[in-house]
Amino acid sequence: MKDRLDDILMDFLESTLEPFPLSALLRFMGEAATAENYEDLSDYLSYNQLAYLNPSWNGEEPFWISRAGLFTGRTALIRPGKKELAAGVFLPGSRLVPYQDPSYLPHELTFIHNGRILPRVPYETDPDEAYPLYSFFGEEYVPQYLSLDNSANDLLFSDSDGADPSCFSLMAVDVRDVYWSGVFRAGDFLAAKVVDWAGGIFELSVVPAPEESDRDEWLGVLEESLVQEFDSIGPSASMDEQLAFSFFLGQELLFNENAVPVGDLLGWSERVDMEPYGVETRLWHKGSVIPAQS
């Protein structure tokens, strides 16, 4: 029964893009609108960060928004590396965090341009280039993500000596038509717009980088939203969850034309950095120990 209800719940959250009251979700699940069910469902959504609550100040039932609703139609910014530009490719890595459905691996995402699905091509790389592109999954998990990219990597990264291979191949997105069409200029960003969150589909285009002052203002909002997240929720279950909640807090102050790649925050901020959390990694107050959670 629980599995069936979980499936129904996820169907609703993945397909409902507009804010919704819990009463609508309970009806969809075929559950009674009792105080106990309201409380249980609210706790479940909040604990697992499946949806976010917009409090009501007028006594009416508050509304929630799903991650699909929060990020559909929104655009992640990516700064291609020199090697990617030269090869005409793009490595998704964790650069779509927190915009993407976290159940998708990077090689499972779909990218379109001018109405055409962009193919994947093998791209030779090494740890120095690839690891930073996967950093928001946590450094400790990067080898697992790389090993799952293709069958050859599964063998390379399962070598019993424990050392990661010095070079390997990843299935990159072929974006030659995007880079080399005459539209892309030095300093431009790839813009990946979420067109189907549950389907893992993004539409690629090219946008110019914002002015430095606008960039700094945007990064300041993201920084402050993360600090609020640390102080109100704690380290969460992943950096993806931390960033997703921060974008919920910032919303239109972050979903605008001044956006830059999320990873830019780490070289810019004096307040936020990646810090160890047991054997894992989280975003946290820079230089501070993350307290154990009860």
Which residues fall in each region the model found?
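Acidic, low-complexity intrinsically disordered regions
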Residues: 1-294
